[in-house]
Amino acid sequence: IRNFLFLFLFFSGIIFISIIFLPSLLLPQKITLFGGKLMGYWSQYCLKIILSTKIVVKGKDNMINDKKFFIACSHQSMFETFFLQTVFNSPVFILKKELTKIPVFGWYLKKIGSISIKRDKITRDNLNFFEDISETTQNSERPIVIFPQGTRVLPDDRPPFKKGASRIYEKLNIFCQPIAINSGYVWPKNGIKKTNKVITISILEPIKPGLQKEEFLQVLEKKIYDELDLVG
């Protein structure tokens, strides 16, 4: 019953916020971004109140505040995309091109400046992908978010990180903020949501620019997976 109630209230709230903020599609971007933050806070409220989830944030002292950076985050559930909007300055997400074609939802994704890519196909857009993220980083204070695992994974899965993460690190030549989140134990990509659990968000020590691509990927993967193993 609590699982059904969570899904019903969560998605009802998201739909309500989306409708209320429809006029923002014609207004300055910052208004639409505020709607995204509300969705982030709503998701946390539903988790805490309905599923009795405890949300713990570790490593706030590791947060980068005085320089440009991008975020590399583990990905186990929808939680990450909502939560990160409440902690960082309206981050820019990299997502599948197909998502931008969904009515209403796709309009929002375009309005907030999401960077899209068509997977598994060589297109002109894909060839310009790294130029797009570089331009976004140079012209905005909003950090880009990447999910180096490539897709949502089960909590105990440890797939190797995608090489695209290291190419982004090399292209941007800025700090990387690694983040480990074990949300899959509460909000799995498939299956019933769990009650009375803890979601731990670990903001890890930044990785400086200048490493070789291969070394960066090894360091990033070890940092995130070691932390996930630690918090369980």
What are these regions (language model features)?
Residues I17-Q29, L33-K37, I49-I50, N65-I122:
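Catalytic core of membrane glycerolipid acyltransferases/transacylases, capturing the structured
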Residues V57, I115-K118, P209:
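Short acidic-hydrophobic, aromatic-tinged amphipathic segments that line or gate anion-handling sites
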Residues L127-G232:
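Non-catalytic C-terminal accessory region of glycerolipid acyltransferases
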Residues S52-K54, S90, K111, E141, ...:
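A generic structural signal for alpha->beta connector loops
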Residues Y41-T53:
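A generic, lipid-embedded transmembrane alpha helix
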Residues I1-L26, F34-K37, D61-I64, T136, ...:
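Membrane-interfacial terminal anchoring regions of lipid-handling membrane enzymes
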Residues I50-K58, N126-N128, N182-G184:
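Short gly/ser/thr-rich secondary-structure transition/capping motifs
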